[in-house]
Amino acid sequence: MRITIFGTGYVGLVTGTCFAEVGNDVVCMDVDEDKIARLNKGEIPIYEPGLEELVQKNHKAGRLRFTTDPDEAVEHGAFQFIAVGTPPDEDGSADLKYVLAVARTIAERMDEYKVIIDKSTVPVGTADRVREQVETVLRERGADLPFDVVSNPEFLKEGAAVKDFMKPDRVIIGTDNPRTKELLRALYS
């Protein structure tokens, strides 16, 4: 399956690499040009046992690519994962500006059905805000395109993230669309 991951931090890099390891075609997108340049050389910005070898192996095999180009990223994946930071806001709540910015980026560029999947650590109700953002942009564009939004929180422990992803004790798929639920089940099977 063709997958795009927005964000190459801990969650995004582990998720993208592990999806590539099981045979998917993955593009990871980040705005940090230096980080993408290092990833394209096989150097990873975090320490996670086994991750660097998997990045190098899958990058060499062509199943894992890294880019700063949002056009390439949106065009590539039927599955668009949002795995960006949600730093604390002034009141301590999660600041969703990066999540909503990615939703806008996807909506501005999509030209076919997309499943937009939120992997970031976010509060309840964020999927509704992502959906509203995408609907607003599509309306501004005059585009009537189908899409679904899914909440798919991660449960990765540092030091065991690759193992946790490859053999999860649970996978949460939050969606109101049975078809989308089956697409995600197939992706994780």
Annotate each language-model stretch with its function:
Residues M1-S189:
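Structural/interface elements that position substrates and couple domains in central-metabolism enzymes
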